[in-house]
Structure formats: C-alpha cells, structure tokens
Design a protein with these regions (language model features):
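Short, conserved sequence motifs used for protein processing/export or organelle targeting and
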Residues: 50, 61-294
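Short, well-ordered helical secondary-structure segments
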Residues: 6, 21-24, 29, 93, ...
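Bacterial Sec-dependent N-terminal signal peptides
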Residues: 1-26, 296-299, 303
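Proline-enriched interdomain boundary motifs that mark the N-terminal boundary
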Residues: 31-34, 143-148, 293-303
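N-terminal capping/interface segment
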Residues: 4-7, 32, 98
Length: 304
C-alpha cells in the first residue's frame, strides 16, 4: 500500500537570523513551473518535450518542468506498454481546460495577448506560446521565495524533502505549498520521436524506445498541498515532507499495461507555491540524493 507520510514543522518567524538556512531572503523575480500534458501515443508531444527542455536549458535555475502523462494518448495499448499515469494527472489536466496535446500551463496563469487552448480564462497553452508566457513570468517580481533539498534513504525506502519558504513582502492571497516528485531517464514507447526528438531515442524493446524526462510520479502532500495561514513580510516557514516510496504506482490505479518500477536514483523534486488552486507564484527544483547504507552523502540544495 502506498503510504504518504507527512511531517509538518511550521515555525512562523518574523526575524530569520537564527532560523533560515538555505532559502534566499532577497526579493527575486518569479520562477517558471511548466506543467506539460503529454502521452506516449501523442505524435506531436516530443516537440513539446524539446521546447520545454530548451526553456529549462536556457534558464536552468529559473524554469522547471513537470511532464504529466494523462488523457487518451497516455493510455497503454497492451500488456507490454508501461503506464505512466498517476492518480493526480487527470484532475490537473481537466483544471487547465486543455483542448489538445501537447498542452502546457505556465505557472497556471492567464496572459494578456496569449489565447488559451480552451475557453477564455483557462490556462492550458499550445506549445508555441510557452516561451512568450515564460518570458512574462520571469519578468515579474515574486513576494515569496522557496528553497528545497531532498534525499532518499536506500535502506528505509523513504524520500525526505525539506522546504523553506520566506515572504519578502505581504500577500493577502491564500497560499499552498506543493512538492512534486518527477522521474528522469524512464524508458518507454513514444509516437513522433523520430520526427521531433530523435536525440531522445535509446536502445530498448519498443520501436522506438524513448528516454522520458521530468515525469510526474507523486505529489507529496496530495492535490491540495499545505495551506499557509500567515503570509506577511518576514515570515519564514520550514516544512519536512516524507514519502514511503512504493515499488510502483499500481495502488489506486488500473491499467491495460503495466506500472514500471520507480527509480529514486533518477528523481528530482519540484516545489512550488500557488495561490490556492490557481496561479503558481514561484517554484524551485532539487535533485534527490540517494543515501546508501554506510555511506554519507550531502543533500543537493536549491533555493529561490
């Protein structure tokens, strides 16, 4: 049984001198969280993967990717196909108002002059608009900074993520902290790979076999995340999140294919602050560092 263990240590501190450890306390601009909706049988989706990766590569400390496999194109065709769906993907996709694949939300925001795929006021954008939307977000100031560090204990099977939130100015909006677990270097089939992303083709049992990246595997605090009740300037909030990682994601899902084993050695976490179920204000990514028995390893830390 998948077990999500959450330990929340909330300490609201108006002065950070003795508490803050790795989050920045200097006012900064927003970072981009691109949630890309994709699927193994979406022929144009590899082009979306290329665009998203290009945005990250051009802004490695400011643009973070979450690839969400959901919808009909993500469904396996038979028992030899991996199922990359999660229990969270459909709801996130439906909330975006997406009308085709690939689609993506840039901070779950709406943009003047950029039309969404669906009805007005929805957030899913066609891939040709991701760069322009990202540039707008990167130019906006953020009222909150976020830091994260992550480690996985190979002997206990527990992923631990420490986050720190610091408010550089006051907001009256509801804030929710989310921690997404993403997996890289996941082999599987992919339509359109030869045409749009041949560099991601690897050896393997599918024709072609594709190296999937940034694949959503879990939301450590559920779909709603952790709500913050104090969001005034100078507030510092540390949290510890834990997940007893299962072998695969079969719990709570059925499939026509199979659920591949999870690989903690190829994982990152993307933490982000959103205004309730709405716009993401900023985010940060941290590599998951695996700690082996009798080995000592420092966490990789990221902050914004």
């Amino acid at each position: 049984m998948m077990k999500n263990l959450l330990t929340v240590a909330l300490a609201f501190v108006t002065t950070f001198a003795f508490a803050q450890t790795f989050v920045s306390t200097t006012p900064e601009n927003k970072n981009v969280v691109l949630e890309e909706f994709t699927g193994i049988y979406c022929g144009f989706c590899p082009d979306g993967h290329v665009i998203g990766q290009g945005l990250h590569d051009a802004n490695p400390n400011d643009v973070f990717l979450i690839n969400i496999h959901t919808g009909g194109y993500a469904n396996p065709n038979g028992p030899s196909d991996p199922d990359f769906n999660t229990i969270f993907g459909a709801a996130i996709g439906n909330a975006s108002g997406l009308a085709g694949y690939p689609a993506g939300t840039v901070n779950r925001a709406t943009f003047s002059g950029i039309s969404p795929q669906g009805s007005p006021g929805t957030t899913a954008l066609s891939r040709g608009d991701w760069a322009a939307a990202s540039a707008i977000i990167l130019g906006q100031s953020s009222y909150v900074n976020l830091g994260a560090q992550a480690s996985y204990d190979m002997s206990t099977g527990i992923l631990t993520v420490n986050t720190e939130t610091y408010y550089t100015s006051t907001t009256t909006n509801i804030n929710n902290l989310h921690v997404a677990v993403v997996e890289n270097n996941v082999p599987g089939p992919q339509s359109g790979a030869q045409n749009y992303n041949p560099g991601a083709i690897i050896s393997g049992p599918w024709n072609p076999t594709y190296n999937h990246q940034h694949m959503l595997r879990h939301l450590m605090d559920g779909a709603m995340g952790i709500e913050y009740s104090v969001t005034t300037a100078g507030t510092f909030v540390p949290n510890t999140h834990t997940w007893n990682m299962p072998a695969n994601l079969s719990t709570g899902q059925s499939t026509n294919g199979y659920f591949p084993d999870l690989d903690p050695t190829n994982m990152d976490v993307v933490a982000f602050i959103a205004e309730g179920p709405g716009e993401i204000i900023t985010g940060v990514q941290a590599e998951v560092v695996c700690i082996f028995p009798n080995a000592y390893d420092a966490n990789v830390t990221a902050s914004s």
